[in-house]
């Protein structure tokens, strides 16, 4: 958990500003709120409300919440659409588009019934807009370029203003050149808290987005015309081991909210606990309509809020259950080499195809073994397909994977990583002695003249 300061810039005078739809007061046109940005890619502490009505803030996984100012009873925010550099995990950065220095953009938090005003400045090389996904707003504030508003041209600032009518979890993203801009990372979350602070209370409340990119090994910019063959599946534009853990106290009531802005569905699975889906795009789920789950599927454009009691201490995996979504970019679309003696084959092929990354002789787990990796130098700005280590060795995961760390005795606002879980004596799976004969593998018969083999540079992944 990083608590470093955000950068702040002076107020920008309201000159040459476009208005998104309705009439606004002279007070609103006097000045635009200051721009607040951050380049931090670690989870920030929850932003406690200092003005406006009280609420229990969320924690954005590997992200932050946008500060606001009160102006005559209206909550004002300033979003800046701009190119950003996002560290996806240590050793890899991506050149994306986002908001206020990051992709995804900052979380916006308001209270049910708030009058909200959002200034949007466009520092992109092309026009844009913002659609407030799932929210009941006036038609002229819906953010669909050409249909409900003029486009926000480069260098211009527009203003959106509406009432936050319904409590829930929402998303924001462009409805202008949507394929390019969303493939480049332009999205964020919006939380409208209940006006009754005692409604459905939880002790810890996390939120993040599911997004995906296609970035070739050695490159930095996503391929925006990719339809399904993405090779980086992320939580808030981070891949494991770059995704922070969600740290909670034992017996906390925990809520985790996530929205899906990828091009496919994701079955999200929590180990060690049962949960209930308590919120969807349409609002809160009545208690009589809930049932226990350990996995919930979230479709494209949907969000889900799940809740559970953290009564089982430990380091619990939390991930998408599509196995290819818990891998990083390396090793996709390469031949299956199980059982094939490779010896110096990797080095020889690497001289011809520098970005070639094979499957190991015994499986993909070799990708996380450092002795094997010594013979497989990584291309620039690339991370291994599966990586990360725990107290017992390689975790063999990547992509959409993190942990929920449950501990006794944490302070109320303590979100620091507590380190590895200390298992009670006798509660860890262990090796036992057996007298079974060793497993013999069937011998592979190589035809006369050798085996035919083709080599391809990895470009994306299988369609999933």
Feature locations, PLM:
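Copper-binding active sites and cupredoxin-like electron-transfer domains
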Residues: 2-464
